[in-house]
Amino acid sequence: MAKKEDTIVLEGRVQELLPGMHFKILLENGMPVTAHLCGKMRMSNIRLLVGDRVTVEMSAYDLTKARVVYRHR
């Protein structure tokens, strides 16, 4: 697992729902990424819909995958 120093935190919007609790997110900088829910969001049964604004964490080593850590209201 990556250290906290190696993660990049960005915001974006859910563009598409993919199978297996994966999502296509369009970041604020215009870059699309594939993301999955973090464990606490899965345990809390938090669901995402198209158009939701989210905060994602990305590894500095793979900028195509991300983890959704927060859904904005």
Curated annotation (Swiss-Prot):
Compartment annotation: Cytoplasm
Chief localisation class: cytoplasm
SUPFAM superfamilies: Nucleic acid-binding proteins
Gene3D superfamilies in the cross-refs: Nucleic acid-binding proteins (2.40.50.140)
GO molecular function: ribosome binding; rRNA binding; translation initiation factor activity
Superkingdom of the organism of origin: Bacteria
Record key words, sorted: Cytoplasm, Initiation factor, Protein biosynthesis, RNA-binding, rRNA-binding
Domain S1-like: 1-73
UniProt-listed InterPro entries: NA-bd_OB-fold, RNA-binding_domain_S1_IF1, S1_domain, TIF_IF1
PROSITE patterns from the UniProt entry: S1_IF1_TYPE
One Pfam family cited in the UniProt record for this chain: eIF-1a
Cellular component annotations (GO), alphabetically ordered: cytosol
Biological role: One of the essential components for the initiation of protein synthesis. Stabilizes the binding of IF-2 and IF-3 on the 30S subunit to which N-formylmethionyl-tRNA(fMet) subsequently binds. Helps modulate mRNA selection, yielding the 30S pre-initiation complex (PIC). Upon addition of the 50S ribosomal subunit IF-1, IF-2 and IF-3 are released leaving the mature 70S translation initiation complex.
Subunit and interaction comment: Component of the 30S ribosomal translation pre-initiation complex which assembles on the 30S ribosome in the order IF-2 and IF-3, IF-1 and N-formylmethionyl-tRNA(fMet); mRNA recruitment can occur at any time during PIC assembly.
Membership in a protein family: Belongs to the IF-1 family.
HAMAP family attached to this UniProt entry: IF_1 (MF_00075)
Protein name per Swiss-Prot or TrEMBL: Translation initiation factor IF-1
